[in-house]
UniProtKB/Swiss-Prot annotation:
Major subcellular location class: membrane
Listed name of the protein: NAD(P)H-quinone oxidoreductase subunit O
Role: NDH-1 shuttles electrons from an unknown electron donor, via FMN and iron-sulfur (Fe-S) centers, to quinones in the respiratory and/or the photosynthetic chain. The immediate electron acceptor for the enzyme in this species is believed to be plastoquinone. Couples the redox reaction to proton translocation, and thus conserves the redox energy in a proton gradient. Cyanobacterial NDH-1 also plays a role in inorganic carbon-concentration.
Protein's organism: Prochlorococcus marinus (strain MIT 9515)
Recorded family membership: Belongs to the complex I NdhO subunit family.
Taxonomic lineage of the native organism: Bacteria, Bacillati, Cyanobacteriota, Cyanophyceae, Synechococcales
InterPro entries associated with the record: NdhO
EC category name: translocase
Pfam family, one: NdhO
EC number(s) reported in the record: 7.1.1.-
UniProt keyword list: Membrane, NAD, NADP, Plastoquinone, Quinone, Thylakoid, Translocase, Transport
Length: 80
């Protein structure tokens, strides 16, 4: 029997990156600069807080924190 591993919900402290395909199709993409930095799609960013369906993400760079919809974020898995 092969059971699927349940997906962990994102929470405060989770390491994430932005899913480019989902973000590009969102209403937020229409309201933002089309030339976004590559690091948001590469990760990792850390979730600082969650309010309803949005997460505040801090990148490991000297840039401001950013709010993204939770469905646009994916868990960052470090390469071994």
């Amino acid at each position: 029997m092969s059971e699927t591993i349940p997906k962990k919900p994102l929470k405060k402290g989770s390491l994430v990156f932005v899913d480019k395909n989902i973000y590009d199709k969102s209403i937020e993409a229409l309201a933002s600069d089309s030339d976004l930095p590559a690091y948001i799609f590469e990760g990792p960013g850390e979730i600082l807080g969650i309010k309803e369906e949005y997460a505040q993400v801090r990148w490991r760079r000297p840039v401001p924190d950013v709010w993204f919809k939770l469905d646009q974020l994916k868990e960052y898995l470090a390469s071994e």
